[in-house]
Amino acid sequence: QPSYDYDEEEDDRAKLRLDAR
């Protein structure tokens, strides 16, 4: 489970942020 919170719609963007790291 991710420590950060995000909307289901933002799920894809959140994953992209993780890859960006």
UniProtKB/Swiss-Prot annotation:
User: GO terms for CC?
Assistant: extracellular region
User: Which keywords does this chain's UniProt record carry?
Assistant: Adaptive immunity, Blood coagulation, Coiled coil, Disulfide bond, Hemostasis, Immunity, Innate immunity, Pyrrolidone carboxylic acid, Secreted, Sulfation
Q: Zinc-finger: present as a keyword of the record?
A: no
Q: Where do Acidic residues bias regions lie?
A: 1-11
Comp. bias intervals (Basic and acidic residues): 12-21
Q: Where this protein primarily resides, as one coarse class? A: secreted
What functional role does this protein have? Cleaved by the protease thrombin to yield monomers which, together with fibrinogen alpha (FGA) and fibrinogen gamma (FGG), polymerize to form an insoluble fibrin matrix. Fibrin has a major function in hemostasis as one of the primary components of blood clots. In addition, functions during the early stages of wound repair to stabilize the lesion and guide cell migration during re-epithelialization. Was originally thought to be essential for platelet aggregation, based on in vitro studies using anticoagulated blood.
Free-text comment about domains: A long coiled coil structure formed by 3 polypeptide chains connects the central nodule to the C-terminal domains (distal nodules). The long C-terminal ends of the alpha chains fold back, contributing a fourth strand to the coiled coil structure.
| Protein name per UniProt | Fibrinogen beta chain
Annotated source species: Antilocapra americana
